[in-house]
Amino acid sequence: MAHTAWIATDPIDLTDMLASVSGPTHGAVASFVGQVRDHDPEATGEVVALRYTCHPDAQRFIEEIVSATVVRHDPQGLAEVQATHRIGDLDVGDLALVVTVGSAHRDLAFTLCRA
């Protein structure tokens, strides 16, 4: 099945990402959603926003990470994996990293999300 990864400047649409890994052969859809929080132990005061930037090769790196994870945990290629990391100015509550996985069974879906 397919796996893709992106670096995005636009807000991440969780509904679209979940739909992209849903299908008639998938009995499980799992996700990881990382969002901007309002505190950081190393920050002075309340966090109200973050600015994410990335290395020029970040797109290639995220693709390689997702590919290597799929090869390691799903060598038969049975799952669909989507990963998006947002860059730019993000407010508290904005989605920063989303990984969605669709597979026949939940164990593989959760394993790929955790990896």
Regions found by a protein language model. Give the residues of each.
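N-terminal, polar/charged subdomain of small-to-medium soluble alpha/beta proteins
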Residues: 1-95, 102-114
